[in-house]
Swiss-Prot record:
This is Pyridoxal 5'-phosphate synthase subunit PdxT. GO terms for biological process: glutamine catabolic process; pyridoxal phosphate biosynthetic process; pyridoxine metabolic process. The active site is at C75 (nucleophile), H166 (charge relay system), E168 (charge relay system). It comes from Staphylococcus carnosus (strain TM300). Gene3D superfamilies: 3.40.50.880.
Length: 192
C-alpha cells in the first residue's frame, strides 16, 4: 500500500522510514492532488498552529475535511485531528475527542516511556516532546488504546488513529505498522 506523510513540517523522513520498515511504500505529500494516489496519510508532529496555517495555505484542510482517507496523527497531528482543543475549536474534527496542548510541560519536560497499547504491544517505545494529551473522549465510538499517568495518549476511531507521542523518533515501527495493517487495510477492504 502507498502511505503518505504530510510533508509541510515535522519528522517526515523518520515517518517514511517506519512506513518502509512496515513493508509499504512511503510518499512525501506536498500537494493536495497527491491525496488521490495514497491509501492513508500520516500527520506528523511539529507545532500545531504552524501545521494548521500551512494546511490552510496549501489547501489541505478542505480536502481532508471532506475525505474519509485513513489518517494517523502524532503529537501536533493528533491536535489537528481532534474535534475540540481546550480553549479553541478543533481543525479537521475527525476524532471525537478534546485535547489539551503541551499538557506534559515544556520542551525541558520531554520524556520517554514504555507504553502498553491495546491491540499492538505492551512494550512500545514512546517519545513525548511538548506533548498534548486527550483530556476527554466525547463518543463511545472512540477506543482508548493507552494512558500515561492517567492521561489518555492514544485513541482510535474508525479510519483515524491519534497518539500524543512521536513513535517515529524510535526504532519501534509497530504503531505505524498497526495503522497500515489494520486501519488502512480495513478501510481499503471495505471500499472494494
Amino acid at each position: 500500500m502507498k502511505i503518505g506523510v504530510l510533508a509541510l513540517q515535522g519528522a517526515v523522513r523518520e515517518h517514511l522510514r517506519h512506513i518502509e520498515l512496515s513493508g509499504h511504500e512511503g510518499v512525501s505529500v506536498k500537494r493536495v492532488e497527491q491525496l488521490e494516489e495514497i491509501d492513508g496519510l500520516i500527520l506528523p508532529g511539529g507545532e500545531s498552529t504552524t501545521l494548521r496555517r500551512l494546511m490552510n495555505l496549501y489547501g489541505f484542510k478542505e480536502a481532508l475535511v471532506n475525505s474519509d482517507l485513513p489518517m494517523f496523527g502524532t503529537c501536533a497531528g493528533l491536535i489537528v485531528l481532534a474535534q475540540d482543543i481546550v480553549g479553541e475549536e478543533g481543525y479537521l474534527q475527525k476524532l471525537d475527542i478534546t485535547v489539551e496542548r503541551n499538557s506534559f510541560g515544556r520542551q525541558v519536560d520531554s520524556f520517554e516511556a514504555e507504553l502498553d497499547i491495546k491491540g499492538i504491544a505492551n512494550d512500545i517505545e514512546a517519545v513525548f516532546i511538548r506533548a498534548p494529551h486527550i483530556e476527554k473522549v466525547n463518543s463511545d465510538n472512540v477506543e482508548i488504546l493507552s494512558t500515561v499517568d492517567d492521561k489518555i495518549v492514544a485513541v482510535k476511531e474508525g479510519n483515524y488513529l491519534g497518539v500524543s507521542f512521536h513513535p517515529e523518533l524510535t526504532d519501534d515501527y509497530r504503531v505505524t505498522q498497526y495503522f497500515i495493517d489494520h486501519i488502512v487495510a480495513e478501510h481499503k477492504h471495505a471500499a472494494v
